[in-house]
Amino acid sequence: MYVCGSTGEGFLLDTEERKLVAETVVNEVGQDMNIIVHVGCPDTRHSCELAAHAEKIGAAATSAVPCVYYHLGEESVYRHWTAITEAADLPFFIYNIPQLTSFNLSMNLFNRMLENPRVAGIKCSSDPAQDILRFKQAGGKDFIVFNGPDEQYAAGRLLGADAGIGGTYGAMPELYMKIDELIDRGEWEKAAQVQNLVTPLIYRLCSFPSMHGAVKGIISLDGCPMGDPRLPFLPVALDDPKLVQLYHDIKAAIETVKNW
């Protein structure tokens, strides 16, 4: 489980709130699954503070984007990530999402980071799907690559991603789990068919004033009250006809593939 990432609104929480979220998740489910805590902040000091806290509470690993807002060079990002790995004796996962950070991880910097024994993997959310292939080939079989873009999950797995971390998984986990199940059985064509059902649903989630509000709305309609996202992300009313229809369409898609 990936905590306080983009969909988890980590950047909209202050440091103490992020610590509380991470600690709550570890206490509730840390015995059943590995918890990766995203600790990236606009500055290195607070990122390191969160990394140390993640180790203290028993998280399995940390992860971080580059510092945001300022357009930093590779050496600055290298030192930022290295400082985080030194702040906690935990595996570290690079988070590459250039469309939000304005920093695209080069192979030169990636190879430098691979020299750090605590760098265990990467969440690859960059647009070119072939980045997954490049990072996996350079990192080796034990290096973990997470697919980021939900709309290419099946393709990302085909290119070498070991798993995925995505923003819409919570709204329709059964469909992503079905893709994994089919891939594990070697039924790639059927996995692609499920992806073809999933992708239009993703686009519809993203058509609302905020995807965060829509995802929380779908989960709330399914019986787990989520509340509203934190501003400036806008909420979506639970009685919004578009949201209700989307909820029913997700359920229909799940029913369609249930016995595949």
Predicted regions and their residues:
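Active-site beta->alpha loop and helix N-cap motifs at the rims of alpha/beta catalytic domains
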Residues: M1-S102
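A general structural signal for well-ordered alpha-helical segments in protein cores
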Residues: R18, A22, S47, W81, ...
